[in-house]
């Protein structure tokens, strides 16, 4: 069984990856002693920049292993693409707090506050996920997945994390927080990016 290391301490992201990888016989694991490593400052202007930066750095701590780093977030059209790369810390969004994530409830509250006068038909947006795969400090490939949806005016669902309770996927009229792990792997931005990664893995030495 092939093992892939994921450069995150976010249990929600690890669950998402594990759910997508399980049907392919791939083991998902975190980087050993990840919590003791110095965090990589996520100061890139794009998801791609942040994902590549994290993959390069964290892969140096797992010699010979393929390490995948994820940078993802929510882009709301009515907010000119915000929260974007600031999704995890949107409630504070100060440059000197580049690695200080705020809690999901506070981030969701800010999005709802900023959309309070926006009509439903203009509350469109998307989740974006960029994965970067690296080994021994060298980028091997990057993958981008998106999921288009609508931002609700109140949260729904108890699964997931982040902005999942606000993000309604029109094709099935459920928020990402109402999906099973299997459904989320099928429909989500992270699932889309990870499927590209799995296809690439088939030719990996």
Regions found by a protein language model. Give the residues of each.
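Anionic-ligand binding patches
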Residues: 2-5, 11-205
């Amino acid at each position: 069984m092939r093992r892939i290391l994921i450069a995150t301490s976010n249990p929600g992201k690890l669950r998402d990856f594990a759910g997508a990888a399980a049907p392919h016989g791939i083991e998902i694991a975190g980087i050993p002693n990840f919590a003791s490593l110095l965090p990589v400052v996520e100061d890139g202007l794009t998801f791609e920049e942040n994902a590549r930066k994290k993959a390069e750095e964290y892969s140096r701590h797992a010699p010979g292993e393929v390490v995948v780093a994820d940078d993802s977030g929510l882009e709301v059209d009515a907010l000119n693409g915000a929260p974007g790369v600031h999704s995890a810390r949107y409630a504070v969004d100060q440059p000197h707090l580049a690695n200080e994530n705020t809690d999901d409830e506070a981030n969701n509250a800010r999005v709802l506050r900023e959309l309070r006068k926006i009509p439903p038909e203009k509350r469109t947006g998307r989740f974006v996920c960029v994965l970067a795969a690296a080994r021994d400090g060298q980028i091997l490939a990057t993958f981008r997945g998106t999921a288009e949806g609508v931002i609700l005016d109140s949260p729904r669902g108890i699964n997931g994390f982040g902005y999942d309770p606000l993000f309604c996927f029109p094709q099935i009229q459920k928020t990402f927080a109402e999906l099973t792990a299997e459904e989320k792997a099928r429909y989500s931005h992270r699932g889309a990016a990870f499927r590209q990664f799995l296809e690439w893995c088939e030719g990996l030495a």
